[in-house]
Amino acid sequence: MKHVDIFTDGACSGNPGPGGWGAVLRYGDVEKELCGGEADTTNNRMELLAAISALSALKSPCEVDLYTDSAYVKDGISKWIFGWKKNGWKTADKKPVKNAELWQALEAARDRHKVTLHWVKGHAGHPENERADELARKGMEPFKKGKAVSF
């Protein structure tokens, strides 16, 4: 099974507002960069889309180390999702889970691979996380100008 390192980030100008996501995928010496965005979104949605898009870009099952600066993504997929599923995608206080469709997509993308999640401190000089942040801002830029783009 191939081993891939993935670094993801999301960005939003206003929350909600125009947003973008970015991901760096590394397999040995080969790197691939992905980014995209939406006109009206939240930072959490962009963080989720970064992870979903990166995992979905892998053509075959892989052993993945996924690095995110989002405790929301890390805790959601590794802790909270079990209760949400048991409760019919409701929170402990019976409210609908926010971004349920993205959590379901992330779970499906994750389940194709052997994924280990890692939390990294954002904006702390971690080179790949900084690059993912640059890609997220690049993905957001067209939406700040009213255009759509995905790379």
From Swiss-Prot:
Subcellular location per UniProt equals:
Cytoplasm
Residues that, per the record, bind Mg(2+) 2: 9, 133
InterPro entries per record: RNase_H, RNaseH-like_sf, RNaseH_domain, RNaseH_sf, RNaseHI
* GO CC terms of this entry: cytoplasm
Query: Signal peptide: which range, if any?
Result: none
SUPFAM superfamilies tied to this protein: Ribonuclease H-like
Fetch the NCBIfam families from UniProt: PRK00203.1
**Function per UniProt:** Endonuclease that specifically degrades the RNA of RNA-DNA hybrids.
Query: What is the designated name of this protein?
Result: Ribonuclease H
Organism (species): Rhizobium johnstonii (strain DSM 114642 / LMG 32736 / 3841) (Rhizobium leguminosarum bv. viciae)
